[in-house]
């Protein structure tokens, strides 16, 4: 198949974030989605243990009202199913990812030298820059939004870039490792329902486990401590739920406060709205309505839509430089493995397969090494150039280069016999008589050399060593 043949791929297949997709892009998870297995086990494990306990109690002939165990079991399984459902709804949907931009935003802002404290986003060309932050108005309040260097856009208000998922997320709350997903505008209500249902389930199992112990204490007429020692399964559930409820219960209380004040976890830790008015606060009822009863905004990304693989790669590689002066896409991103499975696009638009061994190299370090080698080469050339001037202007005695360059060439021009070098190229040891014209050239070289180095000819060479040839008698007639 020709490399220039157009290939259509779905957006999720060339997505540059760290997300994992299932079911053809219908389900989107974070890079740490494997934590879902642990979370599921932590939910289902105690639920199964509680089911076993209640079932054995219902089958025990000594139980006075076994039918009461049926509704208890039903409620526990309803809470468990809801908990798993909210967990999956939180972790498997788009949290509100902001689509990446392929080119930086157009701006008319010019660099202002009078505001040195202003931060700018710029390329290597300092004349063309865009501001790091800009002001937008939200409900009559001025809010600063930042420019995202990765997504090449100004983040919407309340959005932030998640370093784990490598995406900007609307109304970013936090990245939850227990659900393996960012918590944003499109899954926050499910996240709150997940932690609140988990809290309810823990309290429910904790309470009925104690009731089982007390019922044994009453039925068998034994002490409470003896009843505890005989009911090991209930003991395990009590300890587990007691520990767990401090975590999920604390989160539920904290996020209940955030909902009532219309804050996110990110804003609560970063800003202090008690010192200034919260531009998003609509009152307690308005805030609750916004979280639970308002319509969830649709996803801004159509992950199942088709895109041209080559065009998408070119758009990601060839970031325009009209605003930044240079591309903001690094050399490592130009040869990106996540997009095309190790393919590189040349200037004509043709795509080529990159060898496996070259796919994980750090090209930025290679470029830095090349730049250092270029600088060293330039310094060596510069040193060699001055050394060449030194050899031309300060001639050591019996130097074949001197006799060939000045003596022989001069004699060839004047038709005179040099005597500075023998016909077979060996030094004869004879001094060369230099004409007035050549002596003036040599003295000019000496003056230029001493002026450039800031020292007298007799002081020595570049490295400070004494130059015994600087006052050679050969420089005299």
Swiss-Prot record:
Q: Where is the composition biased (Polar residues)?
A: 467-477
Residue ranges annotated as compositionally biased, kind Basic residues, are: 378-388
- Gene Ontology annotations for the cellular component aspect, listed alphabetically: plasma membrane; root hair; trans-Golgi network transport vesicle
- Tell me its EC number(s), please: 2.3.1.225
UniProtKB keywords: Acyltransferase, Cell membrane, Lipoprotein, Membrane, Palmitate, Transferase, Transmembrane, Transmembrane helix
Q: Which GO terms describe its molecular function?
A: protein-cysteine S-palmitoyltransferase activity
Q: Which residue ranges does the record annotate as region Disordered? A: 101-120, 374-477
What topology does it adopt in the membrane?
Multi-pass membrane protein
Top-level taxonomic group: Eukaryota
Q: What is known of its domains?
A: The DHHC domain is required for palmitoyltransferase activity.
Query: Which PANTHER family does this UniProt record tie to the protein?
Result: PROTEIN S-ACYLTRANSFERASE 3-RELATED, ZINC FINGER DHHC DOMAIN CONTAINING PROTEIN
The function of this protein is: Palmitoyl acyltransferase.
Know the name of this protein? Probable protein S-acyltransferase 4
């Amino acid at each position: 198949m020709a490399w220039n043949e157009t290939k259509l791929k779905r957006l999720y297949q060339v997505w540059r974030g760290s997300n994992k997709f299932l079911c053809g892009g219908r389900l989107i998870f974070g890079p740490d989605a494997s934590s879902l297995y642990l979370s599921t086990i932590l939910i289902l494990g105690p639920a199964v243990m509680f089911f076993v306990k209640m079932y054995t109690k219902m089958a025990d002939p000594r139980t006075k009202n076994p039918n009461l165990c049926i509704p208890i079991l039903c409620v526990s399984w309803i809470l468990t199913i809801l908990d798993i459902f909210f967990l999956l709804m939180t972790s498997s949907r788009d949290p509100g990812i902001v689509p990446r931009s392929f080119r930086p935003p157009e701006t008319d802002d010019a660099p202002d030298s009078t505001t040195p404290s202003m931060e700018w986003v710029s390329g290597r060309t300092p004349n063309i820059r865009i501001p790091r932050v800009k002001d937008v108005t939200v409900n009559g309040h001025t809010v600063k939004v930042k420019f995202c260097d990765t997504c090449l856009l100004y983040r919407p208000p309340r959005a932030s870039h998640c370093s784990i998922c490598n995406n900007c997320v609307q109304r970013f709350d936090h990245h939850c490792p227990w659900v393996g997903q960012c918590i944003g505008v499109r899954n926050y209500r499910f996240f709150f329902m997940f932690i609140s249902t988990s809290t309810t389930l823990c309290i429910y199992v904790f309470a009925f486990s104690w009731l089982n112990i007390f019922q044994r204490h009453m039925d068998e007429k034994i002490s409470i401590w003896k009843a505890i020692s005989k009911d090991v399964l209930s003991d395990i559930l009590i300890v587990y739920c007691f520990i767990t409820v401090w975590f999920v219960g604390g989160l539920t209380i904290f996020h209940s406060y955030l909902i009532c004040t219309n804050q996110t976890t990110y804003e609560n830790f970063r800003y202090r709205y008690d010192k200034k008015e919260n531009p998003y606060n609509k009152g307690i009822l308005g805030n609750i309505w916004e979280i639970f009863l308002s319509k969830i905004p649709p996803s801004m990304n159509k992950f199942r839509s088709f895109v041209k693989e080559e065009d998408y790669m070119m758009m990601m590689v060839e970031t325009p430089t009209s605003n930044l002066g240079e591309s903001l896409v690094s050399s490592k991103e130009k040869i990106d493995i996540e997009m095309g499975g190790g393919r590189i696009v040349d200037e004509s638009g043709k795509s080529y397969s990159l060898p496996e061994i070259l796919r994980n190299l750090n090209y930025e370090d290679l470029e830095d090494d090349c730049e250092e080698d270029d600088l060293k080469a330039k310094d060596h050339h510069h040193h060699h150039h001055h050394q060449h001037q030194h050899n031309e202007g300060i001639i050591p005695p019996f130097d074949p280069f001197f006799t060939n360059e000045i003596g022989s060439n001069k004699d060839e021009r004047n038709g005179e016999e040099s005597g500075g070098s023998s016909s077979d190229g060996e030094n004869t040891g004879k001094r060369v008589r230099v004409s007035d014209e050549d002596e003036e050239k040599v003295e000019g070289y000496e003056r230029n050399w001493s002026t450039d180095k800031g020292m007298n000819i007799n002081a020595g060479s570049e490295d400070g060593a004494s130059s015994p040839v600087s006052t050679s008698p050969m420089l005299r007639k």
